[in-house]
A protein has these predicted regions:
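Short glycine-rich phosphate-binding loop at a beta-alpha junction
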Residues: 56-62, 171-178
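Active-site glycine-centered loops adjacent to acidic/histidine catalytic or metal-binding residues
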Residues: 16, 89, 180
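Acidic, low-complexity terminal tails and accessory targeting/binding regions
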Residues: 2-9, 94-106, 115, 165-173, ...
């Protein structure tokens, strides 16, 4: 393959649709809730908003909620041909060990106590919080199965690099990647500390450009595709 045919790869990182565990404010890493009715509706809206984008490839984590969302996008897409979903274990959400399925407030209260802070604001000021919440969870987990920051980032960034390498030929292109809120936050925070990653809505899009082995964050938590799709549905009625 000639290097002159390599081009930039634009990654469309999409968070999966809302699940029953999201709605119940339960910690959801490798445990896997089904999409709610609202989750499916918003995923369809975002998919319609993305329907005129020609994707070179489509990927998701191997967890059901991401696969279901990705299949909705592929079904609604009109611009791409023969788009087949590739499921990657390396794109899974963080594994939270004993906190899987637990109420989110319990996990984060434990982490706040461990870090000796009283609020997320204080945690952000004192720590690289995206990194330390992950490490704290791993330390607090008596099962010793929860993932620490380095373990997560190693598998996730390897997956992203592999995806970029696989799709940079023939002048690159646009790639759909349906993953998880925690993973998107970690990726964005790792690549560029200037973005606020606190909010990461279900079915939102965060865009990253990969060129010559380097990553650049272009946008984060973009809901305009969902808004566009919702407007398209009104017109179709």
């Amino acid at each position: 393959m000639s290097s002159k045919n390599k081009g930039k790869v634009i990654l469309y990182l999409m968070r999966h649709g809302q699940t029953i565990l999201n709605k119940a404010n339960r910690t959801q890493g490798w445990c896997d809730g089904v999409l709610t009715k609202e989750g499916i509706e918003v995923a369809v809206n975002a998919s319609l908003g993305l329907s005129d984008i020609k994707f070179k490839a489509a990927y998701s984590s191997d967890l059901g909620r991401a696969i279901k969302t990705a299949r909705i996008v592929i079904k609604e897409n009109k611009a791409s041909t023969n788009l087949k979903l590739k499921e990657l274990e390396g794109l899974r959400e963080v594994y939270f060990g004993k906190y899987e399925g637990e109420h989110e407030s319990i996990m984060f209260n434990d982490i706040m106590k461990f870090l000796n802070v009283s609020s997320f604001k204080e945690a952000d000021e004192k720590y690289d919080f995206q990194k330390e919440y992950c490490n704290s969870c791993a330390i607090l987990d008596e099962t010793k199965e929860a993932e620490d920051y380095n373990s997560v980032m190693k598998r996730v960034m390897k997956s992203l690099n592999d995806i970029c390498m696989a799709n940079s030929h023939d002048n690159g292109g646009k790639v759909l990647i349906v993953v998880h809120g925690g993973i998107i936050r970690l990726i964005i925070d790792y690549l560029d500390k200037n973005f606020n990653v606190r909010n990461m809505d279900n079915s939102s899009i965060s865009k990253i450009i990969c060129e010559n082995g380097s990553f650049k964050v272009e946008s984060v938590n973009d809901n305009s595709y969902s808004d566009k799709g919702k407007a398209m549905k009104r017109v179709m009625k």
